[in-house]
Amino acid sequence: MKALSPVRGCYEAVCCLSERSLAIARGRGKSPSAEEPLSLLDDMNHCYSRLRELVPGVPRGTQLSQVEILQRVIDYILDLQVVLAEPAPGPPDGPHLPIQTAELTPELVISKDKRSFCH
């Protein structure tokens, strides 16, 4: 059996500690699992602010809770569904009358002499 040198054992321990301290320094002292909820919270806050911007009728200067924002989003979606469910308006029922020459301004009326230049 080989005897382990106590100096070598300490060196390995120091290397291990220095690797951990580098990892902590790179991560600013937070483990990746601790950073995840904060980034998710930022994402959710961004989503709520984006929803607030997209829904019409939300006053800009007032504070709304997340529940109020979601309720306004739901109301807006329901309003859109009602509008889309309505039948589309058709063309007017009356006959389409062509524009008479008398209804045009004199600048728009081309005399018969000038019409020959067009064709």
Swiss-Prot record:
Query: Entry's SUPFAM superfamilies?
Result: HLH, helix-loop-helix DNA-binding domain
> What are the bHLH domain coordinates in residue numbering?
28-80
In which broad location class does this protein mainly occur, judging by the first location in its UniProt entry? Answer: nucleus
Protein modification? Phosphorylated in vitro by CDC2 and PKC.
Q: Which residues form a coiled coil?
A: none
| Compartments, record wording | Nucleus
Q: State whether keyword Transcription applies.
A: yes
Q: Which Pfam families match?
A: HLH
GO BP annotations of the record are: cellular response to leptomycin B; central nervous system development; circadian rhythm; epithelial cell differentiation; heart development; metanephros development; muscle organ development; negative regulation of cell differentiation
Q: Which InterPro entries does UniProt cross-reference here?
A: bHLH_dom, DNA-bd_prot-inh, HLH_DNA-bd_sf
Entry keywords, A to Z: Biological rhythms, Myogenesis, Nucleus, Phosphoprotein, Repressor, Transcription, Transcription regulation
Question: Which GO molecular function entries does the Swiss-Prot or TrEMBL record give?
Answer: bHLH transcription factor binding; leptomycin B binding; protein dimerization activity; protein domain specific binding; transcription corepressor activity; transcription regulator inhibitor activity
Which PROSITE patterns does the annotation name? BHLH
Q: Which GO terms describe its cellular component?
A: cytoplasm; nucleus
Q: Spell out the subunit comment.
A: Homodimer, and heterodimer with other HLH proteins. Interacts with COPS5 and COPS7A. Interacts with IFI204. Interacts with GATA4 and NKX2-5. Interacts with ANKRD2; both proteins cooperate in myoblast differentiation. Interacts with CLOCK and BMAL1.
**Role summary:** Transcriptional regulator (lacking a basic DNA binding domain) which negatively regulates the basic helix-loop-helix (bHLH) transcription factors by forming heterodimers and inhibiting their DNA binding and transcriptional activity. Implicated in regulating a variety of cellular processes, including cellular growth, senescence, differentiation, apoptosis, angiogenesis, and neoplastic transformation. Involved in myogenesis by inhibiting skeletal muscle and cardiac myocyte differentiation and promoting muscle precursor cells proliferation.
Give the protein's recorded name: DNA-binding protein inhibitor ID-3
